[in-house]
């Protein structure tokens, strides 16, 4: 047998031996021969699928030990830990009360279920001591108030809209006390801040002030004659007449009080027993050029021994007990003269005194004034109330508006051709070009019925055919309108109700004679550049004058056409026969379509500041260009009467 063959046989035997040994190990291993799996299925109480809570790892170890012939160390599974939810941590069982613990502990998330549990941390309640720092509070004086430092300049309140508020004058920091101005306007009027004592008086009477550089005046005694009793009164120097001085029981003259011995030297003490001075011979005065200044008002003249006392104009003083009192007769009472009551001005209203505040303005409710306000109240004029005939006071009406403002006083409205925005068509007027144009509306139907002319802040002149028969409460007047249905105009319009409507007494609906009506407004108009009154003239239009009329047109008023602009057209005077007019009307032909203008609008003639109202649009013959229109002439006498009844000045007619 060769060596190579022997090696092959030996390798084959070794291979078979290895395979036999491996087969024996397979049959003996429970994990490879299926005994482990079959044992788990046979013990259902330890099966994880049947009873998941059983510790299957320990049983697996026992089965594995029984299946193996070797006795090795028993297999133990890893210890189970509890994983806490977010916000919890592991603590001992005794430290967790009702699911919370309050002690600071290390944060552990995996808990040993035998000794620890998951618990939520809740900090213990802490008692915080609140310390409040007291804010400094100052008490302001009676003439000061508490304001911010920005509103105080040089020690005085400088706020423009400052109003004195009633209440305690306590001023917390950082505010400061600042002096109130001399007068402060409040809702009740002016409050005058005066010192409590304008002229403070001394609490105890004292001697007159004497200069500190000279000794007090004392007469030079010559003969010591004891008086009957001690006196401490001041004795004036002797005069040439030598009147006897007696004690006068009066408290009006200041009484001399000697100084205390502790504060003044012994040489300046006044003896208690003052001798009566003896008259001295009068030496002849020699002329001298020496200037002697006059004594001050509160100064006692200096006594000079070498100067003789001068004659005095002072009258001798006598005792009051020795004099008879003069007979006093009572002042005779004047005869009962009837009190004159004045008539209040146009801006004032006669009302009860308790309805006037401290500055004389009418109040809707009774006013109670303090003693200080009543002492410095604005003087009021006596008047007689027309309602009940009782006395009253003239008080200013806060709602009064002057009929002619300052910028319009005595000035008639003018035609403004250079205003903007401008019209679109040739017959369109610019904004505020015709400032006296008004519009008459009916409230119940919300319709536009006609036009009008503003002749005062509370009066509009229109056509009687337009407003005759309508309820006063159903009429509204709009001033300052230009574009219908628009609110984007440079200045707003003004809408007000109507108080009365006065139709001309000679108005005839059949002939349209005196087709005029005066509308009195409930509220006064506020004049502006687009709202102004026109002056009136009763003269007929002339051929040389430039006349024109205005309005929005019949169609625009009937349908309230949105965006319709005010129209204006020139007119030419015509004969009265062209429009069948009488003496109360005039006729004029329009350049543009006569139906593009409104009944009640003004026929204005002139230019610049001489524009006058000479007619009110009463009606047209037909629509079209060049058609004749009838205008009612203004009756100035009747209009002035209506103005006079309402206490208005007669300023309508201009010459």
Curated annotation (Swiss-Prot):
Residue ranges of the region described as Disordered: 213-319
Domain of life, source organism: Eukaryota
GO cellular component: cytoplasm; extracellular region; extracellular space
UniProt keyword list: Developmental protein, Disulfide bond, Secreted, Serine protease homolog, Signal
Disulfide bonds: 344-394, 350-383, 356-395, 450-466, 547-605, 579-587, 595-623
Chain intervals for the UniProt region annotation (CLIP): 343-407
UniProt subcellular location: Secreted
GO biological process: dorsal closure; dorsal closure, elongation of leading edge cells; establishment or maintenance of epithelial cell apical/basal polarity; germ-band shortening; imaginal disc morphogenesis; imaginal disc-derived male genitalia morphogenesis; innate immune response; notum morphogenesis
Keyword DNA damage: no
Keyword hit for Secreted: yes
Disruption phenotype: Embryonic lethal due to defects in the dorsal closure and germ-band retraction; these defects include undifferentiated or defective larval cuticles presenting dorsal holes and wrinkles, defective attachment of the amnioserosa to the tail end of the germ band, defective elongation of the lateral ectoderm with compromised interface between the LE cells and the amnioserosa. RNAi-mediated knockdown results in pupal lethality and scarring.
Biased composition (Polar residues): 213-225, 237-252
Peptidase S1 domain mapped to chain residues: 421-644
Family as reported in the entry's similarity comment: Belongs to the peptidase S1 family.
Function: Inactive serine protease that plays a role in germ-band retraction and dorsal closure morphogenesis in embryogenesis; contributes to amnioserosa attachment and epithelial apico-basal polarity by regulating the localization of laminin LanA on the apical side of the amnioserosa epithelium. Contributes to epithelial morphogenesis probably by regulating the bsk/JNK pathway, as part of a negative-feedback loop, and by modulating the cross-talk between the Egfr, bsk/JNK and dpp signal transduction pathways.
The protein, known as: Inactive serine protease scarface
Source organism of the structure: Drosophila melanogaster
Name of the gene encoding the protein in the UniProt record: scaf
